[in-house]
């Protein structure tokens, strides 16, 4: 599982959307979605990682209490309509984002190595680490609720129904070091959502 960022109060926020009793009935496994969360990159060069953390406000929450029609439409699109079970509050509140991420492209402002010139894609040497609810829901709610993945970005990983329960969406892991490990690099991460929205953030990356 990827290194988790700071928990941002998601559990307490989604706790407020349901009954205060010990359990409640739900047709949907995903309890809510966050619309276009604000992105922040945090570098952990000693682990060759950059973590994509996020934050949001109450207007970005889509659930059975906020924007009900959209929540139902998203649930239907994701085929998350037949969970039909009692849920216990202490089991947690699965949360994802809306819309899904279509692609992630990583570039560097300098020459990373002999195969990667300035501003060229680094996707062939970077793995994205994330967790998703998609298999659990598509299988009819069988198996592991949330599965973790580590996939080369150039292989176009499926980022649907990504886990957003904690404070981070995903981490990118460099599989090789830059030619000059003492240099400082500005790494840009461009996220494209399936609705065409693009968000890019840049973070300094220096191993030594």
Cite the ranges covered by each PLM segment.
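Intrinsically disordered, low-complexity segments
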Residues: 12-13
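Non-catalytic macromolecular-recognition regions in eukaryotic signaling proteins
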Residues: 21-208
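C-terminal motif of bacterial Sec signal peptides marking the signal peptidase cleavage site
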Residues: 16-19
């Amino acid at each position: 599982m990827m290194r988790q960022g700071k928990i941002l109060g998601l559990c307490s926020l989604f706790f407020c959307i349901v009954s205060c009793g010990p359990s409640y009935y739900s047709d949907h496994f995903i309890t809510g979605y966050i619309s276009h969360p604000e992105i922040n990159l945090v570098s952990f060069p000693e682990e060759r990682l950059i973590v994509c953390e996020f934050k949001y406000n109450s207007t970005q929450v889509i659930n059975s209490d906020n924007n009900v029609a959209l929540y139902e439409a998203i649930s239907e699109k994701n085929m998350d309509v037949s969970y039909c079970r009692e849920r216990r509050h202490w089991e947690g509140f699965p949360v994802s984002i809306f819309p899904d991420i279509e692609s992630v492209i990583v570039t560097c402002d300098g020459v990373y190595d002999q195969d990667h010139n300035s501003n060229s894609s680094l996707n062939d040497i970077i793995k994205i680490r994330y967790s998703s609810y998609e298999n659990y829901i598509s299988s009819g709610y069988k198996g592991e609720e949330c599965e973790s993945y580590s996939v080369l970005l150039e292989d176009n990983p499926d980022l649907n129904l990504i886990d957003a329960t904690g404070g981070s969406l995903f981490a990118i892991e460099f599989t090789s070091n830059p030619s000059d490990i003492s240099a400082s690099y500005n790494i840009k991460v461009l996220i494209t959502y399936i609705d065409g929205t693009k968000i890019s953030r840049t973070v300094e990356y220096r191993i030594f």
